[in-house]
């Protein structure tokens, strides 16, 4: 591993007091630990046609998408009063490809859960994922809110105050493309192109649309991953029950998400639940920052039909 690292470009996050060194592998930035997991997944993971991949860049709605998808596919076994989501962090319910290849394989033997989560760019997914023709769901979000969410998540993870970790520096990292699994625009573009080529295999979900029109988008999600709601379920309010159970307000209020850490984990569960709001960036961005990031996103996403403002 050390020999591989020596050949890769490096970036040190100065705003985190040099506590993170990122390496550029296959045109995206990642940590040493996640690179090790990425290499293992690329070399050994065998996808199945029945798999459903939940794909995202960090801090774009991953936790929410996982919760909704898990509740949808397990609703025959659990309801809003018995779901494992009420007792475990959602990331313990849906395995993460870059860390849990063996657990994913074990799940196939012990349960029928088809869900796998990943932050990998489309071009860096294991070849078996593309070859298997399995379905993927990609969630994306306004980059300005992504920057703010990422800032607070990492700042609190490393126990730094806002004075110790200037927001201006994390903004510059993102603007220059030096973010985890970034550049962010490249991450979006990779999945966007693939979704246009294979619309029946890749569902594009916008975080803000999921917030503003949850019922129609949760129905869309369920149909796409092969677990559509029946007319009886719709009449019985099953969709609304799932939305309420998986809401930020509900999950963030659970004791498990206030005080605990996942088994073997270092981060407190509460770090995954900060605000769950749109537009918090307005409390952090200067006009100059807004203009800079809007300009580069307009340039990068030109012609894609995507709007992230």
Swiss-Prot record:
<feature type="binding site">
    <location>
        <position position="141"/>
    </location>
    <ligand>
        <name>3'-phosphoadenylyl sulfate</name>
    </ligand>
</feature>
<dbReference type="GO" id="GO:0008146">
    <property type="term" value="F:sulfotransferase activity"/>
</dbReference>
<feature type="active site" description="Proton acceptor">
    <location>
        <position position="119"/>
    </location>
</feature>
<keyword id="KW-0963">Cytoplasm</keyword>
<dbReference type="GO" id="GO:0005737">
    <property type="term" value="C:cytoplasm"/>
</dbReference>
<feature type="binding site">
    <location>
        <begin position="59"/>
        <end position="64"/>
    </location>
    <ligand>
        <name>3'-phosphoadenylyl sulfate</name>
    </ligand>
</feature>
<protein>
    <recommendedName>
        <fullName>Flavonol sulfotransferase-like</fullName>
        <ecNumber>2.8.2.-</ecNumber>
    </recommendedName>
</protein>
<feature type="binding site">
    <location>
        <position position="207"/>
    </location>
    <ligand>
        <name>3'-phosphoadenylyl sulfate</name>
    </ligand>
</feature>
<feature type="binding site">
    <location>
        <begin position="274"/>
        <end position="276"/>
    </location>
    <ligand>
        <name>3'-phosphoadenylyl sulfate</name>
    </ligand>
</feature>
<dbReference type="InterPro" id="IPR000863">
    <property type="entry name" value="Sulfotransferase_dom"/>
</dbReference>
<dbReference type="Pfam" id="PF00685">
    <property type="entry name" value="Sulfotransfer_1"/>
</dbReference>
<keyword id="KW-0808">Transferase</keyword>
<comment type="similarity">
    <text>Belongs to the sulfotransferase 1 family.</text>
</comment>
<dbReference type="InterPro" id="IPR027417">
    <property type="entry name" value="P-loop_NTPase"/>
</dbReference>
<feature type="binding site">
    <location>
        <position position="149"/>
    </location>
    <ligand>
        <name>3'-phosphoadenylyl sulfate</name>
    </ligand>
</feature>
């Amino acid at each position: 591993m050390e020999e591989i690292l020596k050949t890769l470009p490096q970036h040190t996050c100065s705003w985190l007091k040099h506590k993170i060194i990122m390496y550029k592998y296959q045109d995206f930035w990642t940590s040493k630990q996640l690179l090790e997991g990425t290499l293992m997944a690329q070399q050994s993971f065998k996808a199945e046609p029945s798999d459903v991949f939940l794909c995202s860049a960090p801090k774009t709605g991953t936790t929410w998408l996982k919760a909704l998808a898990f509740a949808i596919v397990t609703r025959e076994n659990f309801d809003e009063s018995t779901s494992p989501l009420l007792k475990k962090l959602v990331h313990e319910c849906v395995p993460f490809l870059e860390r849990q290849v063996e657990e994913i394989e074990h799940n196939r033997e012990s349960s029928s859960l088809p869900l796998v989560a990943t932050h990998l760019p489309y071009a860096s997914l294991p070849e078996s994922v593309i070859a298997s023709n399995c379905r993927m769901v990609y969630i994306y979000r306004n980059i300005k809110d992504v920057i703010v969410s990422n800032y607070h998540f990492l700042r609190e993870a490393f126990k730094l105050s806002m004075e110790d970790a200037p927001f201006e520096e994390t903004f510059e990292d993102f603007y220059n493309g030096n973010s985890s699994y970034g550049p962010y625009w490249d991450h979006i573009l990779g999945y966007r192109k693939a979704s246009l080529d294979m619309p029946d295999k890749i569902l594009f979900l916008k975080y803000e649309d999921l917030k503003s029109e949850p019922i129609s988008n949760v129905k869309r999600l369920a149909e796409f991953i092969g677990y559509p709601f029946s007319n009886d379920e719709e009449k019985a309010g099953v969709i609304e029950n799932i939305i309420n159970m998986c809401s930020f307000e509900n999950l963030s209020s659970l004791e498990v998400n206030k005080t605990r850490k996942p088994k073997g984990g270092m981060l407190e569960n509460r770090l995954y639940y900060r605000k769950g709001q749109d537009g918090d960036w307005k409390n952090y961005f200067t006009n100059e920052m807004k203009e800079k990031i809007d300009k580069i996103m307009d340039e990068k996403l030109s012609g894609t039909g995507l709007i992230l403002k």
